Amino acid sequence: MAQRIPQEVIEEVRHRTNIVDIIGQYVQLKKSGKNYMGLCPFHEERSPSFSVAEDKQIFHCFGCGKGGTVFNFLQEIEGISFPESVKRVADLEHLSVDFDWSEPREVADTPENQQRRSLLQLHSKAAELYHHILVNTKIGEPALNYLLERGLTQELIETFQIGFAPQKRDFLSQVFKNEQLDETLFEPSGLFVQRDNGTFLDRFYQRIMFPINDPQGNVIAFSGRLLKTADFPGDEMPKYLNSPETTLFNKRETLFNFDRARKEIRKENTVLLFEGFMDVIAAWQSGVKSGVASMGTSLTNEQIRRLERVAKEVVICYDGDNAGVQATNRAIQLLQENSHFDLSIVSIPEKLDPDEYVRKYGAEAFQNLANHGRETVFSFKMNYHRLTRNMNNEKEQLDYVNELLRELTNVQSPLERDRYLNQIAQEFQLSVHSLEEQFNQLKQEQRSVQRQERQQFYQDEMMPPPMEEPVFEENHVQNKLPLTQVQKAERSLLFRLMNEQGVRQTIQQLPDFSFAHDEYQELYFLLESYATLHQSFDIADFINFLQDNQTKQLAIEIAYQNLSEESSEREVADLLHVIALSSIAEAIEQKKIQQQEAKRVGNQQLEAELTMEIIQLARQLKAQRTFT
């Protein structure tokens, strides 16, 4: 099997792709002369400096300097490897990149791709039919009137391709049969339910239909809202019914409206997170077009990872009732534990949901609330912790204050902490000094617990009992120097990368990460190259994939480590922290060497600049160690 995509294949894919069409899915482009201009997605700017040359099929930002081909753009914006970017472009152009081939082939050549494309066509036809029924037929009039009464416009219904599934249970199946569509696709599509006699009934009936799209805008599933009428009360039916999971649709990875909102999210570096589809649509109609919603379930790590590729800030805008407040608190906890997002909250007043708020107060009021009514996580927590306490009781007041001080240990900004300490002191007639003492005590306890956990971690994970070294070749040196703490951390992290896809995804989202030692960095590059060629990671196969004997031996030693079967998020964070400290220390040493050379040749300006850089790095190193 070839180990990389042949150059002629790369060129063929590029020649059959228009870079403007691809980049236009991420950046709003406007024609300017012979090129297209837009706001750069890689740095903040107010005037466009990002240029796409259609004739040359390249892009360049005159502000930050980034540029390249369509593959380089996707590598940068989606955080993927070069082979993955080639495959990504090929998918968008309906070509399949196979590492064994020498010419591009149409997606239909493989059974899996053929079925996927056929299922996408089936969903597209269903969406078109449902939409036609809603806007053009008498059967759809009650549903259309309901939506118009809810404040939706015809334009909005078109934008979201909202439709209606009639009450007749075999409506869609009969239409598809009349069109002689492949009935073997009915069951895996999720659009139908098969009866005992082998015939098919429509899964969705008497429902307003919301198409659910993948990031490229293809319909992959539906969510149907029950439409109750006098002759169809539907009392025992669920209000919302979603498609089951299929080869197209994984609800843990899917976000409603992500395909439409992505450009705006990229532009603002911010995403608004809603609970329901109607909330997203109402926000869109109000001019807030960076909203998405999870699929009727709590937010998932897979959805968080998708959002991390396009945004730096998440604004949680859930319902204002008690259930919505509880869901907001859970989302905060999940996001704080599994991401590095800046978080803020929009609390909807009067226990309304966003859709109700828009209908009651109008689009302008909601837009103002969404843009200017955001509160910090701590401000939300202040209100949240009141819900379960009797604030007229002195003991519960003190418990409340202690709970807030614990929450305050998660606030990094000194200004924000100072403001809230003064606010708490004023409300409960306490001295700021006493609150600071209590806060510092809690902070010290927190650091002590973290330090103990890290020490236990290194005892349990970083220093496993000695094992017999596998013999690989005759000149293998048995008496090696003891590994340093950094080397142990690097080996443990590589072990996790070999065994856990989630850890690989985490590292891929850290563009500035690198191993401290070249041999481990090289192995990591080879590991990533292997992963792009294989759907699953097999240690033995990976060893065979490696060409250099020393690298193979290193991989074997790492694979033989006696570590737990599954890592924790804390373990991975600790490993990254140890490696990062080493990288800073190494950078300081390199700067010192450069400084001595500048001094030797009499370059005083460079010497002074390097001195300042060394000071900054030393402060950074000290801060990191203090945090530890």
Curated annotation (Swiss-Prot):
Cofactor: Zn(2+); Mg(2+)
Positions annotated as zinc finger (CHC2-type): 40-64
Residues engaged in binding Mg(2+) 2: D319, D321
CDD domains documented for this protein: TOPRIM_DnaG_primases
EC number: 2.7.7.101
Residues that span the membrane, as ranges: none
GO cellular component, one term: cytoplasm
Keyword Transcription belongs to the record: yes
Annotated catalysed reactions: ssDNA + n NTP = ssDNA/pppN(pN)n-1 hybrid + (n-1) diphosphate
InterPro entries: DNA_helicase_N/primase_C, DNA_primase_core_N_sf, DNA_primase_DnaB-bd, DNA_primase_DnaG, DNA_primase_Znf_CHC2, DnaG_bac, DNAG_N, DnaG_primase
Span of domain Toprim: 269-351
Annotated family: Belongs to the DnaG primase family.
Subunit text: Monomer. Interacts with DnaB.
HAMAP family: DNA_primase_DnaG
PANTHER family in alphabetical order: DNA PRIMASE
Function as written in the Swiss-Prot or TrEMBL entry: RNA polymerase that catalyzes the synthesis of short RNA molecules used as primers for DNA polymerase during DNA replication.
Written domain comment of the UniProt record: Contains an N-terminal zinc-binding domain, a central core domain that contains the primase activity, and a C-terminal DnaB-binding domain.
Name by which UniProt lists this protein: DNA primase
Organism: Enterococcus faecalis (strain ATCC 700802 / V583)
